[in-house]
Amino acid sequence: MSFLDHIKQRRTIYAVGKNVALTPEQIESVIKEAVNHSPSAFNSQTSRIVTLFGESHLQFWNIVRETLRKIVPEAAFEGTNAKINSFAAGYGTVLFYEDQDVVKALQEQFALYADNFPVWSEHSSAIAQFAVWTASVSYTHL
């Protein structure tokens, strides 16, 4: 399958489940490879990931649920809770974030471009997320 075919096959999976053909270690390997080989401005590689499986995955979604329970109106919480339950039903969670220490260091090192690094960092994150999403097409229910 070509890269463009992978892009065309990429879809949001709403019915998340635990039927996954890969081990957590294999999933982490695919994700790390995709992120590590994603281009970034000045080869800054600011994108970071956290993968959660098993109990830590469930704990994360319980934290999200209880946090949102405090701010979402009670009348709307049922729908919010259903969405959280659908995410918690998955095999794991991948969290993306940007290493702000690296961004700040680049801003100091290349002062002329300082205002651009936060934006470029977000671009890097988008590219990394796209790479992971597209790589997942090669695997069943990643």
Each model region followed by its residue ranges:
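N-terminal amphipathic, basic helical "cap/leader" segment at the start of enzyme domains
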Residues: 1-93
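Conserved coil-to-alpha-helix start sites within the AMP-binding
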Residues: 123-131
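Short pre-catalytic strand/loop immediately N-terminal to key active-site residues, enriched for Gly-Thr
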Residues: 115-124
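Short glycine/proline- and charge-enriched loop/turn segments
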Residues: 11, 109-116
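Short glycine-enriched loops at secondary-structure junctions
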Residues: 98-102
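Conserved small/polar residues in nucleotide/adenosyl-binding loops
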Residues: 140-141
